[in-house]
Amino acid sequence: MNDAHKKILLKTARDTVTAVIKGTPALKPPQSNDPELTAHCGCFVTLKNGVHLRGCIGQFVADRPLIEMVIEMAKASATGDPRFFDEPITAGELDELDIEISVLSPLKRTDNPLSLRLGIDGIYIKKGRAGGCFLPQVATETGWTKEEFLSYCCSHKAGLRPDAWKDAKTEVYLFTAEVFGAAFKDIT
């Protein structure tokens, strides 16, 4: 994805977050025939205020073009992350936000979870109806080892025992992400 594509997606995410927080009319996706913007791939949109997470929502599987997925995930990240229902993003906070978009590769199941590459691979761990994920950048931001990355995903995201990733009945998937972002106020 080139810089022009990233700029379009970041502007679309910023404009969407602004509209949903200020209660103005929803955006229509920019018209594009560009294969990078119309590809069906999963994505996450992350909003931070300084080092503080303010929302992070995404989908692994896309049922619509990427540009539309970014709009939906930006809306959900701004208003639908249950971790922040008690402290929603305010209009006065918008210029302090940073937006990060992670465009995902398809999930690939692995029988060897320790084959993951820290800082390159994200993980999705599923057992029964429980599941949780970490984006690739979480390993870099936390400095965790592979075992810690897998264990924290099990215990803090999926609600499983920390060592559930070692169980043959637990499904572990790897994915990569193209990650880019910008300060809210710097996006033009």
Predicted feature descriptions by range:
Residues 1-188:
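Basic nucleic-acid-binding interfaces
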